[in-house]
Design a protein with these regions (language model features):
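N-terminal glycine-/charge-rich "phosphate-binding" loop or analogous flexible N-terminal tail
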Residues: 1-48
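Phosphate/diphosphate ligand-binding glycine-rich loop within oxidoreductases
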Residues: 48-104
Length: 104
């Protein structure tokens, strides 16, 4: 069964192509270059194994609850991770990463 990855905003095509090349990945991408409305974020993360987020989206307990217990990783497409509740993620054994160079 493929990993479900939800991408919270448009990222460079090279990154999307890299993810699409993996046959073990099912992608759901919020295709707009603006912040996803919170209600839509909570709906679309359901069942995600991985959330690829942008710094403007809060990755907190509410998002982790909405995603479900199978959530394994929050990959932040940003230099930092101030938007992620790292303590809550650690409690759930969810890996949190960032991209210090922000280039694909």
């Amino acid at each position: 069964m493929p990993y479900k990855i939800f991408v919270t905003r448009s990222i460079p095509d090279a990154g999307i192509k890299l993810l699409q090349a993996n046959k073990n990945v099912s992608l759901d991408i919020y295709e707009r270059d603006q912040q996803i409305p919170r209600k839509e974020l909570l709906r679309r993360v359901r069942g995600a194994d991985i959330i690829l987020s942008i710094l403007t989206e809060r990755m907190d307990k509410e998002v982790m609850d909405a995603a479900g217990p199978q959530l394994k990783m929050i990959a932040n497409y940003a230099v930092g991770f101030d938007n992620v509740d790292v303590k809550e993620a650690a409690r759930r054994k969810i890996v949190v990463t960032n991209t210090p160079h922000e280039r694909v």
